Amino acid sequence: MGGGRGLLGRETLGPGGGCSGEGPLCYWPPPGSPPAPSLRASLPLEPPRCPLRSCSLPRSACLCSRNSAPGSCCRPWASLWSEPPPSPSSQPAPPMYIWTLSCAPAASWAPVTHWTDHPLPPLPSPLLPTRLPDDYIILPTDLRCHSHRHPSHPTDRLLLLVIWTHLGGIWAGHSPWTVIQTAGRPPRDLSPSARPISSPPPETSCVLA
């Protein structure tokens, strides 16, 4: 499995095409590549998979990455949303690219979807898009992934949606989602249960609570 750490769409490319901490930076997707299919268009595709034995999380909370081995502890994309996808006659979802945070060799992480210069995508309720500035990210409270760079860069103003498969954490009166600002420290009004990373390094940092 790759042990590289994503840097907001940039990865270091090691021998054999894997991620490593050394080597020149490469950009993914490559310049000029066609846009990835929308989330709604990808719903009928085979759901992502992650390893059963090497996953450090409970089966119900197993998150998937592109580096994962064959297995089946992940749910179809359609089950990640609390509401059914809109009908095909409605406005299509904005183009998107799917990235992966590979923060530790022994763990599998959820894909991170970047939207740039597009309207806010449909979000799982009870989130309200009007409350989400374009420099905030949405995180499940059971997983802290804080994307951060010094100094801040205009490309950091992305809406990052971490797709969370651990739907068992949703119950009445509780929202599993946490909003964290991508530049600087998280706002002080986060709930105590969020326990955000207070001083992230100038790279993607992931910690399990």
UniProtKB/Swiss-Prot annotation:
Location of the region described as Disordered in the Swiss-Prot/TrEMBL record: 182-209
Membrane topology: Lipid-anchor
Chief location: membrane
SS bond partners: none
Membrane-traversing stretches: none
Tissue: Ubiquitous.
UniProt cross-references to InterPro entries, sorted A to Z: CAAX_1 (IPR031771)
Cellular compartment(s): Cell membrane
Lipidation (S-farnesyl cysteine): 206
Alphabetically ordered keywords of this record: Cell membrane, Lipoprotein, Membrane, Methylation, Prenylation
GO cellular component term of the entry, any: plasma membrane
Propeptide: 207-209
Annotated protein name in UniProt: CAAX box protein 1
Organism (species): Homo sapiens
Species classification: Eukaryota, Metazoa, Chordata, Craniata, Vertebrata
